[in-house]
Amino acid sequence: MKTIASTALPAHVLQPQYDRQALRSRIVHFGFGAFHRAHQALLTDRVLNAKGGDWGICEISLFSGDTLMSQLRAQDHLFTVLEKGADGNQPIIVGAVHECLNAKLDSLAAIIEKFCEPQVAIVSLTITEKGYCIDPATGKLDTRNERIIHDLEYPDAPHSAPGMLVEALHRRRERGLAPFSVLSCDNIPDNGHVVKNAVLGMAHKRSPELAEWIAANVSFPGTMVDRIVPAATDDSLAEIAREVGVEDPCAISCEPFIQWVIEDNFVAGRPEWEVAGVQMVQDVLPWEQMKLRMLNGSHSFLAYLGYLAGFAHINDCMADSALRDAARRLMLNEQATTLRITGVDLIAYADSLIDRFANPALQHRTWQIAMDGSQKLPQRMLESIRLHLQRDTAWPLLALGVAGWMRYVSGVDDAGNAIDVRDPLSDKIRAIIETSSEEERVAALLALNEIFGHDLPQDPQFVEAITKAYQRISQSGARQAIIDTLSL
């Protein structure tokens, strides 16, 4: 069978210009998903093209991904990233990955031993918020999680990412090997501290002495990641096959824009990511808040309200003047004003986001962005609302965004069509929807302390604003509610 590894590719396809035989598994990565392929793996590939070296990546998947990894092996661990701009496409063959391990294809034991190889300097992760097994109410390890319960009973055969990391560090310590840095690349607030809390929480349960050693010797750099990477579809894979002349089941499409901001705190070295445009900084938090509130907050706003109004893609929302205006006003009037970042032109940043959202080549589905809202709302909207309440400043579009989520999870769009709601709290949410009337809906959903905490549901100003916004959507539909809110 022809693959990208065995076929002469068209001249416009960018290919690795370095010796892939020199690569070693210096980076072990959890989660061979779409975002990692189009972001961290691609940027590491750029460093190798510029500098050469041995910073190869070994991909790890525990309980899924065996088909994808079999396909990756069949094409010498190469895959295609298609950057899709309004002016045309650029296909890139990424060669930084040179090895992969999967629990089903290989074994759990082989995966754990891979972490223990002396050359491993970084363990990176894109496993989504759920993968860290953190209790959202406390920010600490969720000891009720089934995988955590298993790992505490069988620490040498872990099923969770925290369990795997702790067992690997335990073995490295026992063997006198240097520790590695743990690099979360997930789009969650304070991701370095999230993974640190998970690892130290697990280690403390096993051995306080081990936890002390990890705290003293392992670093957990924070990161901010940014690139719009829609999930692969049959159409996107077919388009990539036309571009490169052969099918690539591991391929992914994305926008041309890419940004990675990393806290420069590594205990065992790192690639020279700066040459690929990565920003190495002392404090990631201001960058992270800018992105989560201005980009992700407006993305979620458009996802809920756009989907309700019948818009299938973000670029469809951008073609509507009301939604486009609302997104920009939300960014600048209600989100930018909550930030403490310096040296960044936030008006120019907002304009660049609007241009990126309008990219017709991406076809980023509103339904995809609307997933897992219970885990996204707090950092994307609710943190900003708390600041507005403290300052007594206006936040009508944030209120509409939260109300849009409530209307979306109610399960019916403005045209009366059923919505396939995907959320970690979907069972709880469904029970609330089924047992509350339309008039009771806001109060019933606000009782979800995992999302709203204990403070917001007790704040009369907050409750009134969300209730009015919800009524506006219920009575007039999402698009008209946006128009009415813009005229307030």
Regions found by a protein language model. Give the residues of each.
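Substrate/ligand-engaging "lid" and interaction regions
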Residues: M1-L488
